[in-house]
């Protein structure tokens, strides 16, 4: 159980982070090294893995971080559970763009975990999520957009939702989504499960 005053405080924090999100075209076709970060749980332990992958060769290296998670799962406040561990898992990894398992600005306060991490690290991030948290789906020119209060905040490809976190734009998300679910996140997901079993 989380006190109402704490959630109200966290909402204000999210609105502040959202104001600091920079939406600008990155050009993912220029990315040479891409990072992905994911997390798995066993009890109150979180197992986070950050993966840095060379786009051309597919070679990768990774880093893991295990820590206790005491904040409960509350939709819209995922960053309180996962961001601290994810940030530790990607420290020191070499990459130009970070993909986060979660939402960017396709979030009720435009401050999903990919936006939070992107702003805190001042780094280009894209959120890739498995389910829609907010907004309406609208098909335009063979692309399914996520609209929030009349604004395009994300896109859907297959069963996945892509949204800007920081220092990227919707076009970058479209270019990423067209390629299929990112391999670097598949690897991160596999390694979190492996780390959890060890």
UniProtKB/Swiss-Prot annotation:
Belongs to the endonuclease V family. Mg(2+) binds at residues 38, 101. It catalyses: Endonucleolytic cleavage at apurinic or apyrimidinic sites to products with a 5'-phosphate. One of its GO terms (molecular function) is RNA endonuclease activity, producing 5'-phosphomonoesters. It comes from Saccharolobus islandicus (strain M.16.27) (Sulfolobus islandicus). The keyword DNA damage applies. It comes from the Archaea. Keywords: Cytoplasm, DNA damage, DNA repair, Endonuclease, Hydrolase, Magnesium, Metal-binding, Nuclease. Its cofactor is Mg(2+). Transmembrane segments: none annotated. It is found in: Cytoplasm. The record marks 73 as: Interaction with target DNA. This is Endonuclease V. Its EC number is 3.1.21.7. DNA repair enzyme involved in the repair of deaminated bases. Selectively cleaves double-stranded DNA at the second phosphodiester bond 3' to a deoxyinosine leaving behind the intact lesion on the nicked DNA. GO terms for biological process: DNA repair. GO terms for cellular component: cytoplasm. The gene is nfi.
């Amino acid at each position: 159980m989380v006190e109402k005053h704490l959630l109200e405080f966290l909402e204000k924090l999210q609105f502040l982070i959202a104001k600091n999100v920079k939406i600008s075209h990155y050009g993912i076709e220029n990315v040479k090294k891409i990072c992905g970060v994911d997390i798995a749980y066993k009890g109150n332990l979180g197992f986070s893995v950050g993966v840095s992958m060379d786009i051309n060769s597919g070679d990768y290296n990774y880093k893991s971080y295990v820590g206790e998670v005491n904040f409960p799962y509350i939709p819209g406040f995922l960053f309180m559970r996962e961001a601290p561990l994810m940030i530790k898992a990607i420290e020191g990894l070499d990459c130009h763009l970070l993909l986060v398992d979660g939402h960017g600005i396709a979030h009720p306060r435009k401050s999903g975990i990919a936006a939070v991490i992107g702003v805190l690290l001042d780094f280009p991030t894209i959120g890739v999520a498995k389910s829609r948290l907010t907004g309406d789906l609208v098909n335009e020119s063979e692309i399914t957009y996520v609209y929030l209060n009349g604004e395009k905040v994300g896109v859907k490809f297959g069963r996945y939702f892509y949204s800007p976190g920081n220092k990227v734009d919707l076009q970058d998300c479209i270019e990423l989504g067209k390629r299929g679910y990112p391999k670097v996140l598949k690897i991160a997901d596999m390694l979190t499960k492996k780390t959890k079993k060890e």
